[in-house]
Regions:
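The DNA-recognition helices of helix-turn-helix-type DNA-binding domains
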Residues: 125-128, 146, 171
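Short Lys/Arg-enriched helix C-cap and helix-to-coil transition segments
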Residues: 150-157
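Basic nucleic-acid-binding alpha-helical/helix-turn surface characteristic of O6-alkylguanine DNA
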Residues: 9-10, 15-130, 134, 180-186
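Short glycine/proline- and charge-enriched loop/turn segments
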Residues: 54-57, 158, 171
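…primarily DNA-binding HTH/wHTH and HhH modules…
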Residues: 160-186
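Regulatory, non-catalytic segments
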Residues: 130-148
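Extreme N-terminal basic, low-complexity initiation segments
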Residues: 1-9
Length: 186
């Protein structure tokens, strides 16, 4: 299951639409504080403090709570920030448009320490749909609204010729994540 949120009012909209409570907790990473969000059993959000689109909107509509999913996610992040590839993935819940789900599923296949371009993702989707071409810009929009940063590795998506383009958590964090993974794109 995967979840993508299209609005700044994440918790309010989720609670109103899906009728479940949203819980949050925090992880202090070496490159900044991270907000974790869950509906109780699965991770639905992972954002750097101040990240575009998500983190500023969840404070009032969510309840801070300790949950097993936050323990699992923190363990995953501990391994990741030690410069190692975690050998498990916390349970994640992704919903959204079929297009955003497709982009998320492709991002999940990008190996640790490797990158993929927006155009390459667009080509994979075009091939899956049996069409000649898919817009790399549309892929960029979906990547930019990824609500589960790091675990769904949107930081591994780069521009044409490997150029480092925007990252909702900040380009400085994208660079730090790619350096941590010893990616050759930096």
């Amino acid at each position: 299951f995967f979840l993508f949120l299209d609005d700044y009012y994440i918790c309010f909209l989720i609670r109103k639409r899906y009728k479940f409570m949203i819980y949050t907790n925090y992880y202090n990473s070496p490159i900044g504080r991270i907000t974790m969000a869950s509906e109780g059993t699965a991770l639905i959000g992972l954002w750097f403090e101040g990240q575009k689109y998500f983190a500023d909107s969840i404070k009032e509509e969510c309840t801070e709570k300790d949950l097993d999913i936050f323990d699992d996610t923190s363990r995953w992040l501990d391994i990741y920030f030690r410069g190692k590839e975690p050998d498990f993935t916390p349970k994640i819940l992704i919903t959204g448009t079929p297009f955003r789900k497709s982009v998320a599923e492709i991002m999940l296949t990008i190996p640790y320490g490797k990158t993929m371009t927006y155009g390459e993702i667009a080509n994979v989707i075009a091939k899956e749909k049996g069409i000649a071409k898919m817009s790399a810009q549309a892929v960029g929009g979906a990547v930019g609204h990824n609500s589960i940063s790091i675990i769904i590795p949107c930081h591994r998506v780069v521009g044409t010729n490997g150029s480092l383009t925007g990252y909702a958590g900040g380009l400085d964090k994208k660079i730090q994540l790619l350096k941590l993974e010893k990616t050759d794109k930096i």
